Structures are given as structure tokens and as C-alpha cells.
Amino acid sequence: MEHHQPEDPAPGKAGTVEADIPKNHEVLAGPYEHPQDTDARDADGEAGEREPADQALLPSQCGDNLESPLPEAGSAPPGPTLGTLPEVETIKACSMPQELPQSPRTRQPEPDFYCVKWIPWKGERTPIITQSTNGPCPLLAIMNILFLQWKVKLPPQKEVITSDELMAHLGNCLLSIKPQEKSEGLQLNFQQNVDDAMTVLPKLATGLDVNARFTGVSDFEYTPECSVFDLLGIPLYHGWLVDPQSPEAVRAVGKLSYNQLVERIITCKHSSDTNLVTKGLVAEQFLETTAAQLTYHGLCELTAAAKEGELSVFFRNNHFSTMTKHKSHLYLLVTDQGFLQEEQIVWESLHNVDGDSCFCDSDFHLSHSLGKGPGAEGGSGSPEKQLQVDQDYLIALSLQQQQPRGTLGLTDLELAQQLQQEEYQQQQAAQPVWMRTRALSPQGRGATSGRPAGERRQRPKHESDCILL
């Protein structure tokens, strides 16, 4: 509501009004009047009876509103009354007390800010949005794909962005999409999808309602939320599939979605039919054993379904991540705000259902440590060394995928990591070996650094023999 300052009264009448009306309430608010201003209004009414000429100083409708019933003490300020039309129109012309404008300002939520991380992506400096603990992961996952596709660009010095700005960029992208088919039916369907997507946009900042099916990595129950991904051409994947080598689980789960399966479990467990009870227990066991919402069969199907270089959204554990496929391996974009200053940490490998992963830079080169710049490990970050490490890592991943499903999963990868660690220890062993050589001399007899533990246990006996001699 706009606040209008009243016109200055005539010089001959100002003294009478100032004596009866408080300074903070020179113009009454009518039905919107604050309960604390009741006394001021009564005083003004008495002044109006004593000085009829003073009523010309106030709008005529505001004077009529003096007859409206007073609000009860302690009640909230009343809303617009269901009176006559002129009374509603004159409320806009009346200014409210100075205390009331604070209430809309206190109810207004503070904007959400997100830090922007700039990375080198395919030769161009590209922004990605990081998130805090409970950030809007659906919105960020979609927007990061649009940034990596260069469909949305930010100013070069942009360091912080709000959720409203992200929503505005996303809305512009949706409105700029044109239907590929010109038939009337398809255009109407396209317009309906656009309307559904624009309606769903506010939910992207809090979370989307998606219902995965256990039959395929791209199988979801269709909801209006899915229209956003369809319009933008962004694939939506998950890896929560039933292993076809478990026929009991396949029969128990069938082609149901997650919500339907939960309802079936509840129904079967309370059934008097033993077969239904057994089916419900098998389905419940499947949900418990796959609580990570990613199975080995799902990971294999996901790797096969994703296209090389494709940017997609991966759904797991109610979280949406930006995913890509590089050289037949899957990677998730690292958007944790804790890695904002880690330039060498951009992607995280997705090769295991247990969460054991490795960090990579924007070129998918393996990152060895956190918080260390180039050359911090004594030359181990040279291009030749980095290339060898990357090749070893890719070979280990390939061997892992060729393993039988009954094995321990990461045996070859762990072996490669162990060999890599031994190689690092050999590079750093030059100084300790020199110290051990020096310790054998008379000047360094008391030094024990670098000796094995068993050698230290046997040393006191040898020294005691020398002392006795």
C-alpha cells in the first residue's frame, strides 16, 4: 500500500488539529487502522465534532470510516472489509500508521545465495554452481548442465548468484524452446508441457517428486516434474535395478515403481496368503539390501545407456547430480561448496556402488591430494607421470568391469592403488635411506630413525654384550 503524506493545512486551522491529533497519525487509516491507534481516532472524532471545518483537512471517505467498528484488543490488523465499493477504494488513498509497513518486510524471506566456481571446460572458462548442505540439487543439477553446454552464461567476475537469478535463467531457456513439429496437435502438446514445466519451476528450489521404476535406468513414473527434463533434452537416469539373476526378486518387484512396491509390501505382509507374505518379504529384503539405490546391474546398465560425452542428471538417494560419460566411464560433477577453492577437483568417478570414488580435474585426470598446488609432491605432477597414473587408473576400472559379479568388486583397483602408493614411497625413500646409512657411522650410532621395529628390539642385547666386554 502506498503512503501519501497529507497536504499542509491552512495556517489558521493547523493549531486546532495539532492539539487533538498525534503527529504520527495525521491521516487515519480506516479499516486498516492499528489497534494501538484507537485512542487517537476517538480524539480525532471529538475534534471533528467541535470543529466541523477541520474535516476538510481529511479525505471525506476517511471521515466516513470513523464509524467502522473498532478491532478487538490484541487481535491482528483486519483485512479489507466487505463494505461498499467507495470505502474499499478510499482505503488505498489513506496512509497506514508508521508501524505497519514493517510487517511485510519481516515476513519476506531472505534470498538464497550460492557460490560460483569457475573451471576450465573444453578450453573455455565456465561457471558451475556449488551447493551447501541442503541446497536445491534439482535446480543446480539442471543449471550446471546448461552452463556446461554454454546455453547460459554469467559475467566473468560473477562469484555469487541467487536462486531467483537461476530460476530466471531457466525460465528464459524454457520459453526460448520452439516445437520441432508444426502440426497443431503436437504444438498443443508442446504448449501443455511448457505450461507444466513453468508450474513446476518453484519446486526445483526445494525438491522434485520423482518415482523410479526398477525395470530400466531411464524408467520413471511420468509426473509434471519430468516435463522439465523432456523440454530441455536432459536425460534423467537412475541405477536402482533388480538383478535378473535373482528370479525371486524379479517376480516380487515386477514392473512396479517404488511407491507401488511399498504399498505392495504393506499389503502382502498383512495378507493371510503365505505366498503373498513371502513375496512381500522378498520385496522388502530387496529394498533393504539396495538401500544405496544403486546396484551392480544398475551400474552396468547405466554405463551402457549413457552416451559418450553426454551430460545428464543422475538420481540417487533423493539427490540429483550432474553426470557425464568420458572414455566409457561415468563421472559426477563435484558441487560441494567445501571444494570451492579446489581447482583440481571437478569430477568424481562413479564406478562402485559402495561410494568408493576418485576425484578428477576438468580434463578427467586423477587428483592425488587436496589443497596442494602443482609440484607440491616433488615433481609427481609432471605430464608424463600424470598420464601414467591415468592409464593405470583406467586399466584398473576396465579390469573391475570384467570381474565376475561374485568377486569382491574392487580387487584390481585396490591393487593398482597399492602399487601406485608403493611407487610414491620409492620416490620418497631416497632421503630415509641416506639417513639409515649415516646412522651406521659412529657419529650417528644413537639415531634409530629409519630402522625396522624388529631391529630396534634386538639392538639392546647387542649393545649390552659390547658393554660387558
From Swiss-Prot:
The active site is at 137 (nucleophile), 319 (proton acceptor). GO terms for cellular component: cell periphery; cytosol. GO terms for biological process: protein K48-linked deubiquitination; proteolysis. Keywords: Hydrolase, Phosphoprotein, Protease, Thiol protease, Ubl conjugation pathway. The record marks 412, 415-416, 419 as: Ubiquitin-binding. Hydrolase that can specifically remove 'Lys-48'-linked conjugated ubiquitin from proteins. Has exodeubiquitinase activity and has a preference for long polyubiquitin chains. May play a regulatory role at the level of protein turnover. This is Ubiquitin carboxyl-terminal hydrolase MINDY-1. The gene is MINDY1.
